[in-house]
């Protein structure tokens, strides 16, 4: 799903391309995709000289593949923008969200830039707007993550589960630990020793690295039976109180954000209506009733677009803009 989204995003944004090469596993090699009227065949990814002359390589093939082929991809000077978790916490690999820390992309000793986890990306875009006003000390976040975050096959399984339940048939469960249709699953990825899942710890560790901050993030990540776009309920504690008016203005003017906050008219972000959109949408902005330095708000973002392909392409656009590639 993310690979095809890359092609859509590159085309939508009129990304400057002299030549587009597609690489994949033996399963994908030989497939053909049309891009800007030209048919391109997927080549087999191998340890050879295929990346000679390549300026930017977008990789979204999983951590194992990224680690195995990183040297092959970068050895002739290509910038590898990697969507996997392989390098995110490596000290010599920048972890970049262009609305937050674009300049980090300029220091990449290994020629690799890491794309953060989808839930982290949309959260830090929103946090940055408030961090510009006053330092954020703590974050509590609960995520509501769509089925497609686990891949296209997982989304297909959710469709099939709904059909099976409504038809009174036995339910197929393969992509998730339990039936997702008519259910919520409070586990994404495996559990770690501290009782948090790897997904939840990504939000803690990645946020600190991206924001260059001592911010503490406590997350609960939940898989929900929505198809596309992740939602997050976020509570923050700031060093000084931030008024609702200040917060609304900051979100309205924030890079990559759209304010959608009119409770009287029942206007707030919802995943059903925001799939396929580029920005992160913010609504339900309130003062916290338990802490005078607290704010709470709700965000929705398309995890395949801003949470993956779009963020990577925006990193590349930044490098081109500042003439730091090619």
Regions found by a protein language model. Give the residues of each.
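N-terminal Rossmann-like NAD(P) cofactor-binding subdomain of oxidoreductases
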Residues: 1-180, 216, 240, 249, ...
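Short acidic/glycine-rich loop or secondary-structure boundary segments that cap or lie
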Residues: 149-152, 192-195, 226-229, 244-245
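C-terminal active-site/capping subdomain that shapes the small-molecule cofactor and substrate pocket
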Residues: 215-326
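A glycine-rich, Thr/Ser-enriched phosphate-binding loop motif common to dinucleotide/cofactor-binding enzymes
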Residues: 111-122, 195-204, 209, 307-311
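Generic solvent-exposed, charged/amphipathic alpha-helical segments
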Residues: 7, 204-208, 248, 252
């Amino acid at each position: 799903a993310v690979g095809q989204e890359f092609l859509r995003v590159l085309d939508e944004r009129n990304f400057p391309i002299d030549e587009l090469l597609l690489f994949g596993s033996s399963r994908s090699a030989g497939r053909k995709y049309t891009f800007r009227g030209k048919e391109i065949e997927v080549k087999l990814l191998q340890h050879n000289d295929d990346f000679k002359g390549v300026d930017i390589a977008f990789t979204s093939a999983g951590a194992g593949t990224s680690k195995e082929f990183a040297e092959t991809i970068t050895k002739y000077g290509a910038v590898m923008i990697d969507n996997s978790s392989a390098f995110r916490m490596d000290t010599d690999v920048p972890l970049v969200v262009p609305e937050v820390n674009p300049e980090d992309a300029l220091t990449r000793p290994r020629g690799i830039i890491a794309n953060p986890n989808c839930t982290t990306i949309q959260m830090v875009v929103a946090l940055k707007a408030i961090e510009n006003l006053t330092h954020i000390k703590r974050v509590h976040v609960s995520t509501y993550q769509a089925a497609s975050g686990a891949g296209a096959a997982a989304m297909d399984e959710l469709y099939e589960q709904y059909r099976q339940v409504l038809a009174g048939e036995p339910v197929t469960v393969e992509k998730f630990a339990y039936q997702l249709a008519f259910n919520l699953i409070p586990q994404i990825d495996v559990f770690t020793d501290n009782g948090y899942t790897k997904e939840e710890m990504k939000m803690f560790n990645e946020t600190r690295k991206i924001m260059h901050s001592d911010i503490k993030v406590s997350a609960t990540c939940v898989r929900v039976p929505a198809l596309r776009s992740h939602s997050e309920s976020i509570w923050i504690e700031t060093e000084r109180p931030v008024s609702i008016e200040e917060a609304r203005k900051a979100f309205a003017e924030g890079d990559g954000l759209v304010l959608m906050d009119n409770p009287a008219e029942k206007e707030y972000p919802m995943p059903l209506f925001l799939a396929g959109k580029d920005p992160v949408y913010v609504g339900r902005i309130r003062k916290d009733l338990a802490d005078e330095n607290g704010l709470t708000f709700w965000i929705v973002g398309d995890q395949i677009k801003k949470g993956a392909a779009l963020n990577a392409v925006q990193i590349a656009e930044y490098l081109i803009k500042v003439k730091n590639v090619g």
